[in-house]
Amino acid sequence: MLFDIYRKTFEADNDAFWWGGETHYRSWDDGTMYLYLFIVFISFLAAWWCDKRRFVTNASRCGSKYKISRCFLIIHMILLLFMGLRGSWVGIDTIVYSQTFENATSLSAVFNDDSTTEPLYKIFMFILRTIFFSRHVAIFIFSALIMYFVFKTLKKYYNSLCLAVAIPAFVCIYYFHSFNLIRITLAASFLLWSTPLLVNEKYKQYSIRILVTTFMHYSSIVLFLPLGL
């Protein structure tokens, strides 16, 4: 029943995509939905196990810290591998990022493409294109940065969070969206990682990070609002 609703929505919005001289159509696959449900389930299971490690006696606290770090690493790597190793057609915008990477052969090519894309993103793509020759590597690096910032924040506030809720919530609400909305998810994860600066009233440093992130995605500028309040 639920899959039928998803399928109808998917088919209604399944427009053609042109890239590389070819027209492509996305195809529905129940197996993909089962895979996504598996990711949600395994992230909940690992987060629950990590929460369980929290309730230990003082005598075994050192050992528990090691187990907690290992648990964080396991969850991190599972989510990173699925996100970073996805195909170019997983996520509508992934192919657009791939195309931007392929075309970023010089700064002039990057900045003369008649797009309104943020300058920091263009420079970052040019740097990646200079170092690497595969768009899949670029997508993996974007994914690795997103996951790093999110999990560094979760780990910092570990003692104040219920991971069995926090991690599955991240997966269901933001993780799958990041397969498509790469730039804004990277900007959001970086600013999430910067939240301690706001909490500790280090407004100048926080403002600098907002300003920098704004040149990755212009919507980041709204984060100046909490400073005004």
Which residues make up each language-model segment?
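Short acidic/glycine- and proline-prone juxtamembrane loop motifs at membrane-interface regions
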Residues: 178-185
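Membrane-interface alpha helices of multi-pass inner-membrane proteins
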Residues: 174, 205-228
